[in-house]
Amino acid sequence: MIDPRYPLGPMPQPRDLSDDERQEARAALRALPGELRAAVAGLSEPQLDTPYREGGWTVRQVVHHVADRHLNAYVHTARVLSGGEALAQPAHEEAWAALPASSFATELSLLLLERLHIHWDEVLADVTDWQQAGLRPDGSEWTLDGLLGQAAWHGRHHTAHITRLREREGW
């Protein structure tokens, strides 16, 4: 049985990507807003407020989380490309998910993701040195390759949380 926390398996470690893998990851980021929108299409308010697994976030919280983390990853990208010494410190995910903003309409985060991913992909189109790195809050390096690969996985991972819930519930 698949662990409901990791429908695509555990998060892969950041690594260098081949040119083909990089193109696939960029394509995954371009596709994510539409795939996430399709995953929540037609869900009622009670369904949006259903946890994707016992003890997990609601579908609504997952959508907002993806937008929040991808906005943060875009800022990481900007910091690396502009020579910033350290990447932005991420928000505390559990505390952030518990704030009133997590109950906003999913459309707000879906619109943010659509525009953000268009812009982010345009920025990535000009990258020539994918080994440029920034420092993570723990002091380790994170290359643009690693950031891109993990962002693509992250979007697919959370979309799968929602689609698997829909399959289980017959929605």
UniProtKB/Swiss-Prot annotation:
InterPro entries: DinB-like, DinB/YfiT-like, Put_metal_dep_hydrolase_YfiT
Keywords: Cytoplasm, Hydrolase, Metal-binding, Zinc
List of residues binding Zn(2+): 65, 154, 158
Any one GO molecular-function label of the UniProt entry: hydrolase activity
Pfam family, one: DinB_2
Requisite cofactors: Zn(2+)
GO cellular component, one term: cytoplasm
Main location: cytoplasm
Cofactor: how bound: Binds 1 zinc ion per subunit.
Annotated EC: 3.-.-.-
Region Disordered, residue ranges: 1-23
Cellular localisation: Cytoplasm
Function: Possible metal-dependent hydrolase.
Family of the protein in this entry: Belongs to the metal hydrolase YfiT family.
Subunit structure: Homodimer.
This protein's name: Putative metal-dependent hydrolase DR_1024
Organism: Deinococcus radiodurans (strain ATCC 13939 / DSM 20539 / JCM 16871 / CCUG 27074 / LMG 4051 / NBRC 15346 / NCIMB 9279 / VKM B-1422 / R1)
